[in-house]
Amino acid sequence: MTTTELTGWPAPTASGRVDAVVHLPGSKSMTNRALVLAALAAEPTAIRGGLRARDTELMMAGLRSLGVGIDDAGDMWLVSPAELRGPAAIDCGLAGTVMRFLLAAATLATGEVSFDGDPRARERPLRPLLDALRQLGAELRDTGGRLPVTVVGSGHLPGGHCVVDASASSQFVSALLLVAPRADTPVTVGHVGRTLPSVPHITMTVAMLRERGVEVAGTDGSWRVQPGPIRGGTVQIEPDLSNAAPFLAAALVTGGRVRVPDWPMRTTQAGDALRDLLTAMGARCELDATGLTVTGGPVIHGLDADLRDVSELVPTLAALAALADRPSTFRGIGHMRGHETDRLAALAAELTRLGGDVTATDDGLVIRPRPLHGGVFHSYGDHRMATTGAVLGLVIPGIVVENIQTVAKTMPTFVELWTGMLR
């Protein structure tokens, strides 16, 4: 065990205004969707720019255990689809995309496929997806609607109509849509919950299906997918815009400038909302064909916003709000209690520990800026909590992030990129 693992990671303090260009790795959301679609396709797929991180490594390991061929050619992966076969044991880690997307795909396999993961993964919601898959004809064994789960595969999924309460996670809908083209009959998915969070992630799923020749109809709340082949070909993964959040926040915190090359002009990624959100908080955001440049202003403004569509951005936005000129209110994010940790409780606890004034409400956070001081910032094994501590450390001396290694879930190179930004 290293000294950093024992004592925590001293978050570096910026010596002045940050002025940096940060090249980000590929999108986790796009990478794992692309891997599942490639595994279910009618022909091989080349994936370029895919993210190499724990979540994607777990996805590839799971697909390989089901018989899918994945050759690593350095700058791309060549995925050779195959009939999925058990028996297999899938380690989901803490990856929601693995425990939901791959579980749905396993209903097409022959034989038994078991799923389990990290202790926290056993607490993450899964029952609505299991119920919906059963409505489509899948056979599953579970205890209490959470991991561990065993899929008893017959080699096909009958299809038909299902309803799902996706209030806890839009990944339930995406999982059903991803497997739907391989069902025996058309699949209709209806959302019956009170709210539907993270809609851009469903939009991404639909767009990626259509790009591969799948016929998908419907809008938020109801979707219909026709059975048919999924095309292969070449897929280019965009940079991970949500993982850009802490780096772009550095521009606001230090009054500096950060540029992210290859930011897409049009995208379905939820992280693209950073352009509007950071502008509202006082930044200047300039997008052109080569990338996005964010320049911080003299102060950070508080933010009053419904963030249900972009909840993965909330930890970074909370750090900015703690340093702002007026209180902030974040709404529509009650589902964050079921993320890698209860992020609402965790953010309230850690910001308060450093001298902040934060209240976790039923569906959000109220953050009242106060003078902050150094101290240990606990990550709760959550990559976005860890990067939040790094943002605060830019201007609050003495912050030590516990378990910075958890960033390996989606960005193993975070510390290298972060320290490089400050050189």
Curated annotation (Swiss-Prot):
The keyword Glycoprotein does not apply. Its EC number is 2.5.1.19. InterPro entries: Enolpyruvate_Tfrase_dom, Enolpyruvate_Tfrase_sf, EPSP_synthase, EPSP_synthase_CS, RNA3'P_cycl/enolpyr_Trfase_a/b. 3-phosphoshikimate binds at K28, S29, R33, S169, S170, Q171, S198, E312, H339. Phosphoenolpyruvate binds at K28, G96, R124, Q171, R343, R384, K409. This is 3-phosphoshikimate 1-carboxyvinyltransferase. Catalyzes the transfer of the enolpyruvyl moiety of phosphoenolpyruvate (PEP) to the 5-hydroxyl of shikimate-3-phosphate (S3P) to produce enolpyruvyl shikimate-3-phosphate and inorganic phosphate. Pathway: Metabolic intermediate biosynthesis; chorismate biosynthesis; chorismate from D-erythrose 4-phosphate and phosphoenolpyruvate: step 6/7.
